[in-house]
Swiss-Prot record:
L-methionine binds at E56, Q99, D239, K270. Coiled coil: none annotated. It is found in: Cytoplasm. This is S-adenosylmethionine synthase. The lineage of its organism: Bacteria, Pseudomonadati, Pseudomonadota, Gammaproteobacteria, Enterobacterales.
Length: 384
C-alpha cells in the first residue's frame, strides 16, 4: 500500500448532537435501572432554551424525564444563560408514545432464545492492532483530545473554556503503518475575554501536547486551533442538536463501514445498537487472538427473526488462518442471535449514558471491549 493520509474527527460532550445523545441514553439508563426488559427508543432535540424528548417507550418504570434532562445538561456544564443554554431554566418538552404492538409480537417470544430482532438492518464491527485498544488511531486520538478539553475545563486548569468543542486528526500512513501526524484541528468554545494568542498557546500546551505522542509530531505537522478566530457562541445556541447524528464519531471515524443505524436512546433489543456492539466484540477478539491484524465483521437481521441473515468476516489480507475458518470460528464461539448477544455481553444494565460521548468503542470498561475469547479462538485455530 502506498503512502496515504487518513482523517477522523470527534466532538465533545457539549456539542449539541452529543447533548442529545447523552439525554437519550440517560433516559434509557434510568428506565433500565427499574425495568431491564423495557422497550426504549428515545430521541432528543435541543436548541436555544429548549429540549424536546420524544420516542416510543414501553415500560413498567416511571422516570422523571425533566429532572434527568436538567441533570444531564448540568453535568455537561451548561449552567448559565451566558453560554446560551442553561440547565436550570431551559424548557423541557416530552412527547413519548408506546412501542408498536406490531413490533412487539415479532420481538417477544415464549422461548427467550427465539427473541426476534427488533428491526431489519446491517451492522459492522471493526478492530485493528494499530493502537493498544485495537482501534484506529485517528478516531482514538480525536476522542482523547476532546476528552482532555473537558477535563481541563472542569478541573479549572483552563476556566475560560466552554463545553462545545471539536477535534480532527490526520494521520500519515506508509504501507499501512502509522509514520506520523500530518494535521491537527481543535476548535473549542471559549469565554468572551480570552484572546486568540493566549487561547492557542494554552490549548497547545494543556490539551494537544499531553495527548498526542511526540514521536508522531514533527516540524511539518500542521496545527489549526480555533482557525476562525472566535468561538464564543456554541452549543445549542449555535446549532440545534439531534440524537443519532454523530454515527461515525460514535464508531470508527470512517475507517470501517457503517450500517447506518444510530445507537443512543435504544434498548438492547434494537440490533442497530446491540449487534454493532457484538460485531465489535467479535472483531476485537479475532485481532487480540492474532488471527488477523485488521478485522471487519458484518452481521444482518430480519425483523422478528432470531438468526442473523448473514455474517461476513473481512480481514483485508491480514488473516493468519483461512477466511473460511474464521467464519466457522465466529459461528462456534459467538451467539449473534438478539437474546444470545444480550446475554453474552450482559447488556440489560444502565451502562449507556457513558457511551454517549467520546466513542462507543475503545474504552475498556464496556463489556464488548473484553478480549476473553481471544485465547479460545487462538487455540481452536491451532495457532501456537
Amino acid at each position: 500500500m502506498a503512502k496515504h493520509l487518513f482523517t477522523s474527527e470527534s466532538v465533545s460532550e457539549g456539542h449539541p448532537d452529543k447533548i442529545a445523545d447523552q439525554i437519550s441514553d440517560a433516559v434509557l439508563d434510568a428506565i433500565l435501572q427499574q425495568d431491564p426488559k423495557a422497550r426504549v427508543a428515545c430521541e432528543t432535540y435541543v436548541k436555544t432554551g429548549m429540549v424536546l424528548v420524544g420516542g416510543e417507550i414501553t415500560t413498567s418504570a416511571w422516570v422523571d424525564i425533566e429532572e434527568i434532562t436538567r441533570n444531564t445538561v448540568r453535568e455537561i456544564g451548561y449552567v448559565h444563560s451566558d453560554m446560551g443554554f442553561d440547565a436550570n431554566s431551559c424548557a423541557v418538552l416530552s412527547a413519548i408514545g408506546k412501542q408498536s404492538p406490531d413490533i412487539n409480537q415479532g420481538v417477544d417470544r415464549a422461548d427467550p432464545l427465539e427473541q426476534g430482532a427488533g428491526d431489519q438492518g446491517l451492522m459492522f464491527g471493526y478492530a485493528t492492532n494499530e493502537t493498544d485498544v485495537l482501534m484506529p488511531a485517528p478516531v482514538t486520538y480525536a476522542h482523547r483530545l476532546v476528552q482532555r478539553q473537558a477535563e481541563v475545563r472542569k478541573n479549572g486548569t483552563l476556566p475560560w473554556l466552554r463545553p462545545d468543542a471539536k477535534s480532527q486528526v490526520t494521520f500519515q500512513y506508509d504501507d499501512g503503518k502509522i509514520v506520523g501526524i500530518d494535521a491537527v484541528v481543535l476548535s473549542t468554545q471559549h469565554a468572551e475575554d480570552i484572546d486568540q494568542k493566549s487561547l492557542q498557546e494554552a490549548v497547545m500546551e494543556e490539551i494537544i501536547k499531553p495527548i498526542l505522542p511526540s514521536e508522531w509530531l514533527n516540524t511539518s505537522t500542521k496545527f489549526f486551533i480555533n482557525p476562525t478566530g472566535r468561538f464564543v457562541i456554541g452549543g445549542p445556541m449555535g446549532d440545534c442538536g439531534l440524537t443519532g447524528r454523530k454515527i461515525i464519531v460514535d464508531t470508527y471515524g470512517g475507517m470501517a463501514r457503517h450500517g447506518g443505524g444510530a445507537f443512543s436512546g435504544k434498548d438492547p433489543s434494537k440490533v442497530d445498537r446491540s449487534a454493532a456492539y457484538a460485531a465489535r466484540y467479535v472483531a476485537k477478539n479475532i485481532v487480540a487472538a492474532g488471527l488477523a491484524d485488521r478485522c471487519e465483521i458484518q452481521v444482518s437481521y430480519a425483523i422478528g427473526v432470531a438468526e442473523p441473515t448473514s455474517i461476513m468476516v473481512e480481514t483485508f489480507g491480514t488473516e493468519k488462518v483461512p477466511a473460511e475458518q474464521l467464519i466457522l470460528l465466529v459461528r462456534e464461539f459467538f451467539d449473534l442471535r438478539p437474546y444470545g448477544l444480550i446475554q453474552m455481553l450482559d447488556l440489560l444494565h444502565p451502562i449507556y449514558k457513558e457511551t454517549a460521548a467520546y466513542g462507543h468503542f475503545g474504552r475498556e470498561n464496556f463489556p464488548w471491549e473484553k478480549t476473553d475469547k481471544a485465547q479460545l479462538l487462538r487455540d481452536a485455530a491451532g495457532l501456537k
